[in-house]
Amino acid sequence: VPVLEVNSELADAAFGSAPERAAVGLPTAAGARESWLRAVALGGVGHYAAARAELARARRATADPALLSLTHGTEGSLLRQLGWHTHAAVVDGRAAALVLPAAVGRTPAPAATPAEILHAEAVCDALTGLAADALGTLRPALAARLLNRCRKYLDIHLPDAGSAWRPRVRLHWVSAETALSAPGSGLISVPSADRSADPALAHAEAAVVLAENSPSLRHRVKSRLLLAAASAASGDLDRSRALATEVDRDCRDHELLPLRWACGMLRSGVEPTGDGAEVAAACARLLATRGGRLRSASEVLGRP
């Protein structure tokens, strides 16, 4: 993520080693990009209402299409975390509309300037966001097409996996989720030469490798959570339980409440005698006080 000329504490809380800082207080944003970073950090610890307010501030403070797109993509992520995929698709559509038309006519060459890099990351965020929304509305084939488009764009415009770790990690996340939602469909190819590998496991493991070499603790934790889910789906419950226990501890220590809720839900399935269900319920109650309304199956809880 290009974070030049922004407060380093905000950057570290959003995409670095100290996401828990957002739970105790963050510096005031000096501009639209810092407001976006504040929103990302606040969303990571489950302060949804505060994150949405910060996204609104960011949108009022900029006319840059790429940054505006990122604010909409972040709002889509917040909605998806709570189960509101249909609503998320609307704001992710706005994110895509802000950057995709310009991307169509762009010269097929690596992004070179900070502005070009930001635009390319916004394109990838919009495409992976829409793919995740498609999964949540039971359209895995659409998700796979969007992921393929993102992969091709990423390979051309952000070819350096080291500097473009975040869009690549996200691509592996949603690829793994798509493979999990449509097992045996062949919609998702494995990201390696071993074509016999389980695509969900392979993408989850690839995300872990990339995230472990990134500065973002939150991305490392989420990648291990996804690997725990993929391991459970493949029948390796021991590995899943071990990973989920590790993830729960990290979420607790670093105030990653949304991920701890998701981990609790997984743990309630792979270890029914444990405290996963209780932890998930407690997290859901706390998220609700922070503006995070989880969608029920019948949507009786209302709108997000």
Annotate the PLM regions.
Residues 2-10, 30-47, 67-85, 122-139, ...:
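Tandem amphipathic alpha-helical repeat scaffolds
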Residues 52-139:
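A generic tandem-repeat structural signature
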Residues 146, 150-230:
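Aromatic-anchored, glycine/proline-accented short structural segments
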Residues 212-254:
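Intrinsically disordered, low-complexity segments enriched in Gly and acidic/Ser/Thr residues
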